Curated annotation (Swiss-Prot):
PTM field: Synthesized as an inactive proenzyme and activated by proteolytic removal of the inhibitory propeptide.
Keywords from the UniProt entry: Disulfide bond, Glycoprotein, Hydrolase, Protease, Signal, Thiol protease, Zymogen
Glycosylation site positions: N158
Pfam families: Inhibitor_I29 (PF08246), Peptidase_C1 (PF00112)
PANTHER family named in the record: CYSTEINE PROTEASE FAMILY C1-RELATED
Biological classification of the source: Viruses, Viruses incertae sedis, Naldaviricetes, Lefavirales, Baculoviridae
Function of the protein: Cysteine protease that plays an essential role in host liquefaction to facilitate horizontal transmission of the virus. May participate in the degradation of foreign protein expressed by the baculovirus system.
Family per similarity comment: Belongs to the peptidase C1 family.
First and last residue of the signal peptide: 1-16
Chain's gene name: VCATH
GO MF, any single term: cysteine-type peptidase activity
Bridged cysteine pairs (disulfide): C133-C174, C167-C207, C262-C310
Official protein name in the record: Viral cathepsin
Amino acid sequence: MNKILFYLFVYGVVNSAAYDLLKAPNYFEEFVHRFNKDYGSEVEKLRRFKIFQHNLNEIIIKNQNDSAKYEINKFSDLSKDETIAKYTGLSLPIQTQNFCKVIVLDQPPGKGPLEFDWRRLNKVTSVKNQGMCGACWAFATLASLESQFAIKHNQLINLSEQQMIDCDFVDAGCNGGLLHTAFEAIIKMGGVQLESDYPYEADNNNCRMNTNKFLVQVKDCYRYITVYEEKLKDLLRLVGPIPMAIDAADIVNYKQGIIKYCFNSGLNHAVLLVGYGVENNIPYWTFKNTWGTDWGEEGFFRVQQNINACGMRNELASTAVIY
């Protein structure tokens, strides 16, 4: 059963207070103007409108039934498959070597604060935009190292995703990669440069890294099997922000609030866990995304805890230790 039919089956057909499906043509023209869309032909424009209309219907249904809110945004004329193919990039091969040490977190969660967020301690760097390059794995990996550097040295830095795309021969650049193999590649490369020394191009290119300009070096990496989702709270406070794998299909049109309904049809995107809290008696996780600050809650999103939202527990969480 697809996700739209699931919502209809459980809740019935509803109307959104914010959007009216009958006004889809008007919304679409506003969308085309706002995002400067040029489809090249009326045939292609009509095709995009039909996709837009389908996405609008999903937005309306979700807005009525989820605690989060969804909106028409820059992805609204793309099918979910197109968005996943162009704007994510997590690849999950059938088998990978355990270069990073695997740790099983099988003890019950400890007693910690009800709320915690590394952003409040100024240990999370600015939200970036990967664009149409499947390098979420590089962004999430380096975002965790940027935070580790900030925790250790009290300084925010901006590391080079382009170096990872060009010089990480374990992963596949804009064609995808994995979190733990990215850490493996950094250890093998010897370190990572600043983005200012190796700027982002959103495309695969020849490796041009300068080992004399490495700012961050990784000495160890770990993968965690979490028996209890709540155990991630202890891990987050202990090691810093954690890169994790999710299925991004249900967050594409997200605007704000806590997502209660995020299914997992296959992991495809890497994001960074930065905090957790409680709002209106709903416990949530906070993630940093890589789709720019014009998406979601200024580039961040929240999901309900303890429901394996977006499949967040289906792949091992990965972290690394810097020198």
